[in-house]
Amino acid sequence: MSFNHQEIEKKWQGYWEENKTFRTPDETEKPKFYALDMFPYPSGAGLHVGHPEGYTATDILSRMKRMQGYNVLHPMGWDAFGLPAEQYALDTGNSPAEFTEHNINTFRNQIKSLGFSYDWDREVNTTDPNYYKWTQWIFLKLFEKGLAYVDEVPVNWCPALGTVLANEEIIDGKSERGGHPVERRPMRQWMLKITAYGDRLLEDLDELDWPESLKDMQRNWIGRSEGAEVHFNIDGTDEKFTVFTTRPDTLFGASYCVLAPEHALVADITTADQKEAVEAYINSVKMKSDLERTELAKEKTGVFTGAYAVNPVNGEKLPIWIADYVLATYGTGAVMAVPAHDERDYEFASTFNLPMKEVVKGGDITKEAYTGDGAHVNSAFLDGLNKEEAIAKMIEWLEVTSAGNQKVTYRLRDWLFSRQRYWGEPIPVIHWEDGTMTAVKEEELPLVLPKTENIRPSGTGESPLANIDEWVNVVDPETGKKGRRETNTMPQWAGSCWYYLRYIDPNNSEALVDPEKVKQWLPVDIYIGGAEHAVLHLLYARFWHKVLYDIGVVPTKEPFQQLFNQGMILGENNEKMSKSKGNVVNPDDIVASHGADTLRLYEMFMGPLDASIAWSENGLDGARRFLDRVWRLFVQDNGELSEKITDAPNKDLEKAYHQTVKKVTEDYAELRFNTAISQMMVFINDAYKAETLPKEYVEGFVKMIAPVAPHIGEELWSKLGYNETITYASWPTFDESKLVEDEVEIVVQVMGKVRAKLTMSKDASKDEMEKLALEAIQDQIEGKTVRKVIVVPGKLVNVVAN
């Protein structure tokens, strides 16, 4: 008989809720363990089968750690601001707040139906004013430290929609919604100076237990480059511009310069006869995204400004071009071009027939750029030096002559922090009529997002908040000065940058987090989520954490000690699940048909946690069959405990049991859930063959399977006679001495060929081994004379006979 999953799951979920089984106490002598999931965005589509994969992994760890005597913090919450809710509100006229609340309730019910051991008293929601009060407080601290500033930044402006679009909302230069043209235009935006933390974000990666591939992604994103800044005067004017180069040693080989089309100097230096061509080119670039502009494979385009720069090292005049592959937002927005020794410059020079000058020996510049090392030539005081020596000498020359200086730059850009949206945290800043701006006072936080029926875009590029006059317009009560509130809102990243801190102290109205509690719980011991957040979310969260460390709010330099990315669950056809393909599997259906325990077991047994694997109905059925086998082994058809279970020991199962405890304990800790489950299956096979089942082993097994299948775990535990939940029962231990093999397999050879295999005591003497071996191969050596017997204790017997 199989078990009734609907009955059992409802019963134990009710028990856990009523008894607050998973409530995490703050004061405790126990060691701590903080297991964190990347909290979900509560979309209208609800939970899909990909969500529970990571959640089950942290839940297994949390449940094991509780049984091992740890005080476990395992929370859940909602990353609930964001574009889809605003889009829904625009399309339907409903409120994004109501939509979000409805979705959260759906998600919460779905998650509870899967039996995760979350402490729901610590639930957070980024759209709750009591939560975003502290998101705004962190912004004030960034503002005070000079890390939040206003800048003119090119954004994706869609005139037809009257709004700024995120890169993700644009497809082939047109708005995803309505297919309207999109152009780049500068707009006043809030920026966060993440670049000020570039070195620390890079160096501290070394101390983290993260996958190396993920650390490399962050290193590349930060993109630290050492080199020099070089100042170029513009011929015939007082103007100058600066370039950054990692190869100052090739300055003698510079043959032209390129400015970004948006560079502030372009309008001033363009000559009258080039003006028309330059303006036409600038207009054509407005439609392109940064990604399109910098694509390596694309055809090089550009136009000559008519102006010349002066090479500081030799006085040569270099033509100044503009080209879209140089971005105003990257570096200085200007580059010196050395086509003989840089691939991109070589392509551009070849396209526009610009001169090339070899300054490093070793290649053939008639065929391609030479980017390797070699002796310098045509370079005056650098001639004969290698790359490293020449770089050092050129930097020295630049600094002595004030023509430049040593410089470290980052690929990392400052973080564009404002959004022209309604559904986000208001930025707590007021712009006064005299041109000054001040932050909202701390005691006035939270600055609450006003309710409004009209969340249509303002049409001016400002957010819909600009339409709410009574909210936007303010008067200083002391001076009578008039002002306007900042109408931009924060991006969705803001609330997710620090949520792991709020779980530690979710109801504190006086502080972001209590200093004693944060000292107790940080760092997060394990953080599991999707690889799509490998760069931005993790980088932003690390940045905010370091700022909070600098102002004494948190005691650790890093938030997340260990990080793991789960793989993706694909459709049965190995394609990504999506509504359009009709291959999405809804966990609610599986919970109804097979049970939550089966879904949890199946997702952990599919393969390694970090692999992307196709969903399989057969695999799901197999997981259910295994749980049924476990149930039938321990429970009779009448619901009573099996009569095979006794208090007497059973030597036959001893080794298998201790092996299972060892392997499951180690594999759970290392997130190798699929191999832990395999080992439990092996044990169940052995247990079916056994005459009797020692109660100690049955209890140990139930404790091991409970983290994966908690409902069946609780039900079996109560059938074993326990009135208390299994949650805090002590984890089983193993005895190493019981794992040692008493018997070994001996190979028997005749004239070097294997003729038999024997099992015997590992302590058998040479004589005993020889005697047993000769008996086993009697028919092989009949009529032959045994000349010699070679015995290797514990391994083999080789008989020489002819």
Swiss-Prot record:
Q: What is this protein called?
A: Leucine--tRNA ligase
Q: HAMAP family this protein is in?
A: Leu_tRNA_synth_B
* Organism this protein belongs to: Bacillus anthracis
Record CDD domains: Anticodon_Ia_Leu_BEm (cd07958), LeuRS_core (cd00812)
> Which Gene Ontology terms cover its molecular function?
aminoacyl-tRNA deacylase activity; ATP binding; leucine-tRNA ligase activity
Q: Which PANTHER family match?
A: LEUCINE--TRNA LIGASE, MITOCHONDRIAL, LEUCYL-TRNA SYNTHETASE
Q: What is the lineage of its organism?
A: Bacteria, Bacillati, Bacillota, Bacilli, Bacillales
Known EC number(s)?
6.1.1.4
GO BP terms: namely: leucyl-tRNA aminoacylation
Which residues of this UniProt protein bind ATP?
579
Q: GO cellular component terms? A: cytosol
Gene3D superfamilies attached to this UniProt entry: 3.10.20.590, HUPs, Isoleucyl-tRNA Synthetase, Domain 1
Intracellular or extracellular location(s): Cytoplasm
Give the reaction(s) catalysed: tRNA(Leu) + L-leucine + ATP = L-leucyl-tRNA(Leu) + AMP + diphosphate
Task: Return any one Pfam family short name.
Answer: Anticodon_1
Q: Which family does it belong to?
A: Belongs to the class-I aminoacyl-tRNA synthetase family.
Q: Where is the short sequence motif 'HIGH' region located?
A: 40-51
Keywords tagged on the record: Aminoacyl-tRNA synthetase, ATP-binding, Cytoplasm, Ligase, Nucleotide-binding, Protein biosynthesis
Residues forming the motif 'KMSKS' region are 576-580
Which regions span the lipid bilayer? none
